Amino acid sequence: MQKATHSITPEGFPVIGLTALAALVFAIIDCWFMAVVFLLLCWFSVHFFRDPERVVPSAPGAGVSPADGRIIKVQPMPDPFTGEPRMCVCIFMNVFNVHVNRFPVSGTVQSIAYHPGKYFNASWDKASTDNERCAYDIVDADGLRWSMVQIAGLIARRIVCRVEEGDTLRRGERCGMIRFGSRVDVYLPEEYEPKVTVGETVFAGQTVLAAKKEQPAE
């Protein structure tokens, strides 16, 4: 299991290095237009692959957002592993968001299912079933099952998974990323309810996405 310790995610170093080198080469041969183009690409790459630290909420039993972005759906959807309807929260990431993904809860990865697919706009309904995606079946400390799905989008063409089946991670711990715009869906256990609404902006590892339902007083 790979852990990021830098302000830039490891996947970004090759891209940043190549664009910086290209800018330098074009500057040396006095091709300033291309030098500026690659310098701007280098700046964009640094911005895209940034990996800021986050303050994970200490509230017990809370599930946090696995991604930066905007909530585009909060509704029941078929679970990717069981097919049964479960409350799902969908987060859309544009190219300007931080794209490092984090674990929504402390728990163990029971299984990982990768599905090659198409690259429809990640905000479309059929992206959940037709696009390239990677699904994680997670069991938390209470034995409750969560599902998290990384979905590639129109521009995103590579899903990065940093965990393996059997790995145990803490809530808010880094677990992967999707390059250049994408979406992450979280399927909640029946015992949890969403704490976000459509249109809300969320931050990975920091925004409380769901909490345990209050038990009715006897």
Curated annotation (Swiss-Prot):
Q: Where is this site: Cleavage (non-hydrolytic)?
A: 181-182
List the subcellular locations: Cell membrane
Positions modified as Pyruvic acid (Ser)?
182
Q: In which pathway does it act?
A: Phospholipid metabolism; phosphatidylethanolamine biosynthesis; phosphatidylethanolamine from CDP-diacylglycerol: step 2/2
> What reaction is this protein's catalytic activity?
a 1,2-diacyl-sn-glycero-3-phospho-L-serine + H(+) = a 1,2-diacyl-sn-glycero-3-phosphoethanolamine + CO2
**What family does the entry list?**
Belongs to the phosphatidylserine decarboxylase family. PSD-A subfamily.
Function (record text):
Catalyzes the formation of phosphatidylethanolamine (PtdEtn) from phosphatidylserine (PtdSer).
Q: What is this protein called?
A: Phosphatidylserine decarboxylase proenzyme
Classification from the root reads: Bacteria, Pseudomonadati, Thermodesulfobacteriota, Desulfovibrionia, Desulfovibrionales
